[in-house]
Amino acid sequence: MKNQDQALIFEVSKEGRIGYSLPKLDVEEVKLEDVFESDYIRVEDAELPEVSELDIMRHYTALSNRNHGVDSGFYPLGSCTMKYNPKINESVARFAGFANIHPLQDEKTVQGAMELMYDLQEHLIEITGMDTVTLQPAAGAHGEWTGLMLIRAYHEANGDFNRTKVIVPDSAHGTNPASATVAGFETITVKSNENGLVDLEDLKRVVNEETAALMLTNPNTLGLFEENILEMAEIVHNAGGKLYYDGANLNAVLSQARPGDMGFDVVHLNLHKTFTGPHGGGGPGSGPVGVKADLIPYLPKPILEKTENGYHFNYDRPEAIGRVKPFYGNFGINVRAYTYIRSMGPDGLRAVTEYAVLNANYMMRRLAPFYDLPFDRHCKHEFVLSGRRQKKLGVRTLDIAKRLLDFGYHPPTIYFPLNVEECIMIEPTETESKETLDGFIDKMIQIAKEVEENPEVVQEAPHTTVIKRLDETMAARKPVLRYAKPAPVQV
């Protein structure tokens, strides 16, 4: 049943079928034209599907069974930290005092929620080594943009209008150069060396009086710790630039190392990744930004403060970059992250990193004989393989990813980072058991052997899914975004 094709909800529709009946009107009827201008009133009825409640329940249940999520199976998507989301988080987020409040309520009536937000900020300050944190940004890339706007405001306040360039490594997340561009900067690429780390000599070459910031993920997207980070920070700071920390890989250093101690001036976090907010379905996320003291004046307003009279939002921020989101951030995700941090404690967070790193290194060593290992050294929370040897036999990394679907696994991240040919990036996270890891590894080994003995099986995969291979070029260039009702059959 899971792999059967599913009709569109419009195709299930039958004229006259009713899903829900409204009770008889017991108040005076109000005509739409008495309330709305004619421009806002439909001339024709909306073409909505006519289905029963049972039809719609079966339809969406069937669709949900075709989805893959952390609760249904292993999800080794590199640089995405698809860890299990503890269900206690959901219970706490549904407390009436959190779920039934509104951001326009008087501050005096939501002191408990504000206390949670303030305490969460304090925990994140301790975890990152920053001086303060704002919870306003909605997700990772939004946090990146916010952090870069803070850096821009800082430089402009100091009269440094010529600092128009942001440096990113060739292994950087794609959102880094995108966020820099949206924030009004020009992106400059710094190369990696033969060890997969930022090339210090190339960094010295590109850093100058026009440098606004260097954006880094540490460990980087290859899963390798930038061991020269203190020297890199000195190079950037001596040139008058700022050091930005992309928190996508914070799961690798929790309670082990802090960005603030490495010399970073700004950090964004992904609460929906590192701190177990559910993600993968389009949102919501949460991307708090932490800063050092000299950037505090520019934080988006309002900022949450604690006084002897309780908690309040301070809007008196003349140098602030303004708001970056309505209200105060994605509160529900913040509740979940707070619950996770309090449940784990410092020792638990330290164990998170230890098991995440252990799992990644175990998988890397077991798979290394069957796939190319571009950087043969200890990794952190994730690692990168290459399908170069499989490509020589006519099988691409894309084919390997499609074959994994036949075994019920979500594929790893592929073709990223861009500086590794036929890249396969795997992040197991700390929440997976050895048995789960071994099951995935065994299938990866099986696929490697199939490439050598029967490559057509891999080249033509997937074989068991409802949808085989999409025409991705056509889907991108000519997407079908609306249902077109079939024309009446001419008799």
From Swiss-Prot:
Subunit structure: The glycine cleavage system is composed of four proteins: P, T, L and H. In this organism, the P 'protein' is a heterodimer of two subunits.
Its biological purpose: The glycine cleavage system catalyzes the degradation of glycine. The P protein binds the alpha-amino group of glycine through its pyridoxal phosphate cofactor; CO(2) is released and the remaining methylamine moiety is then transferred to the lipoamide cofactor of the H protein.
Catalytic activity: N(6)-[(R)-lipoyl]-L-lysyl-[glycine-cleavage complex H protein] + glycine + H(+) = N(6)-[(R)-S(8)-aminomethyldihydrolipoyl]-L-lysyl-[glycine-cleavage complex H protein] + CO2
CDD domains: GDC-P
Keyword Plastid: no
Record's keyword terms, sorted: Oxidoreductase, Pyridoxal phosphate
Protein name: Probable glycine dehydrogenase (decarboxylating) subunit 2
EC number: 1.4.4.2
PANTHER family referenced in this protein's UniProt entry, alphabetically: GLYCINE DEHYDROGENASE (DECARBOXYLATING), MITOCHONDRIAL, GLYCINE DEHYDROGENASE, DECARBOXYLATING
Listed InterPro entries: GcvPB, GDC-P_C, GDC-P_N, GDC_P, PyrdxlP-dep_Trfase, PyrdxlP-dep_Trfase_major, PyrdxlP-dep_Trfase_small
SUPFAM superfamilies documented for this protein: PLP-dependent transferases
Pfam families named among the record's database cross-references: GcvP2_C, GDC-P
A GO molecular-function descriptor: pyridoxal phosphate binding
Gene source species: Bacillus cereus (strain B4264)
